[in-house]
Regions:
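Canonical P-loop GTPase G-domain recognition
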Residues: 101-151, 158, 311-316, 321-373
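NTP-binding/hydrolysis catalytic cores, primarily Walker-type P-loop NTPases
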Residues: 363-418
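Switch II of P-loop NTPase G domains
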Residues: 2-5, 27-31, 54-70, 236-237, ...
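Alpha-helical coiled-coil heptad-repeat register
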Residues: 126-129, 133-136, 140-143, 164, ...
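Conserved C-terminal guanine-recognition region of P-loop GTPase G domains, centered on the G4
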Residues: 29-38, 70-75, 87-101, 247-248, ...
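Flexible beta-alpha connector loops of hexameric P-loop NTPases
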Residues: 20-25, 55-59, 117-122, 161-162, ...
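Conserved G1/Walker A P-loop phosphate-binding module
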Residues: 7-10, 148-267, 271-278
Length: 418
């Protein structure tokens, strides 16, 4: 199990989940919560699940389960609990009072991990904004709960700085961060516009956290992105050019990983980053085919894409980590294209490239034209933005066979074209 490297104190926690008819598998969700807790530097010493029609509106779990959790806290010398859902301010305050310990929820935990992962100025702005929005509604309970240990999960902002706890100062800081983020978003839109004008198609690499997205981009392009076997190892999007056959190119963008119950504070704060998938021409969905929860993770990814408005695009599903699959292989899921691969070993990646070439061909127009030697500049544009299949030098000019993006087809036609 992975542990976070800037841990101030060891936190021993009890995990709490509520199984309702709407929840598919709370036990698996708590396993994931345990991994999240470990990533943030906490040790899980116990898990409690309550079957209920709905979560308790006042305390998340019922009185009997609260007593059970209190006994576990004492028995295992634990100093906090983490609930598998986002708690309301009232639930957090009441549970903290009943248990007399530090109370956290999945959202607080994920925000804490993001705070430690953010490296760029944009990422730090987005994370701090999400943290402060979450805290602003929970100041009274959080101030008491988080002060119990003087540090640890929930107290750290990006760069290890302490988060603000004064409501007035939080409002001021949120306004400043929103203004900074607006400038960053303008810059991102400018870059996106330049890509569009460059006529290069873009494929967004999406997937559940730790599915192998960064490893895929590194293997394909040598991007040099941090690729660890940890949840949310990558927060900041990275774009690289992938060289394909016949001189064709496509832009690949790595994105932040998705997860069940992704906090809406993060979705809102990371909107400009997540929208890389919305504005991409194609989606490459990386699925960890060795994970027992692969099907549930797939549905989470599709639901998140739907919420982002990133539907209606051609999707390539990569059944990744084939080198780690044991027993019955994962069945092929619905997608326009499905490729079995291992981003780590490179298995299947040539097939992925072939699919990308096919997709590019579908978006291009085939031409056979004779260009005068004075029109060689147009051939250079074809070479740069399309696929130059062949060129034959003749006395009266250069005969070209090529595929070009529809957007530049008219502009690269020779004057002799009728």
């Amino acid at each position: 199990m992975q542990f976070y490297d800037f841990k101030e104190i060891e936190e021993r926690v009890i995990l709490i989940g509520v199984q309702t008819e709407q929840d598919e598998d709370v036990a698996a969700s708590l396993d994931e919560l345990e991994e999240l807790a470990a990533t943030a530097g906490a040790v899980t010493v116990g898990k409690v699940i309550q079957n209920r029609e709905a979560v308790h509106p006042g305390t998340y779990i019922g009185k009997g389960k609260i007593e059970e959790v209190a006994a576990l806290l004492a028995a295992y010398d634990a100093n906090g609990v983490i609930c598998d859902d986002e708690l309301s301010p009232a639930q957090m305050n009441n549970l903290e009072r009943e248990l007399d310990c530090k109370v956290m929820d999945r959202t607080l935990l994920i925000l804490d991990i993001f705070a430690g992962r953010a490296t760029t100025s944009e990422g730090k702005i987005q994370v701090e904004l999400a943290q402060l929005r979450y805290r602003s509604a929970r100041l009274v309970g959080l101030r008491e709960s988080l002060s119990r240990l003087g540090g640890g999960i929930g107290t750290r902002g990006p760069g290890e700085k302490k988060l603000e706890t004064d409501r007035r100062l939080i409002r001021t800081r949120i306004s400043a961060l929103k203004a900074e983020l607006a400038q960053v978003e303008k810059h991102r839109e400018l870059i996106r516009g330049k890509r569009t004008r460059g006529n290069l198609k873009t494929a967004a690499i999406v997937g559940y956290t730790n599915a192998g997205k960064s490893t895929l981009l590194n293997t394909l392009t040598g991007a040099g992105i941090l690729a660890e076997d940890k949840l949310f190892a990558t927060l900041d999007p990275t774009t690289r050019v992938l060289e394909l056959k016949d001189g064709q190119q496509i832009l690949l963008t790595d994105t932040v990983g998705f997860i069940r119950k992704l906090p809406h504070h993060l979705v809102e704060a990371f909107k400009s980053t997540l929208e890389e998938a919305k504005y991409a021409d194609y989606i490459i969905h990386v699925l960890d085919s060795s994970n027992p929860q692969a099907e549930l993770q797939m549905h989470t990814v599709y639901e998140t894409l739907r919420e982002l408005g990133a539907t209606g695009k051609k999707i390539i599903t990569l059944l990744n980590k084939q080198d780690q699959v044991q027993g019955e292989a994962l069945r092929d899921f619905r997608a326009d294209y499905t490729v079995k691969c291992s981003a780590r070993t490179g298995e299947g990646l040539e097939e992925l490239k072939d699919v990308l070439v096919k997709l590019l061909a579908e978006s291009q127009i085939y031409l056979e034209e004779l260009y005068t030697y004075k029109e060689a500049g147009k051939i250079q544009i074809i070479r740069e933005y399309g696929s130059l299949l062949s060129e034959e030098y003749r006395e009266d000019g250069i005969f070209v066979k090529a595929r070009v993006p529809a957007e530049i087809f008219v502009s690269v036609m020779p004057k002799s074209h009728k």
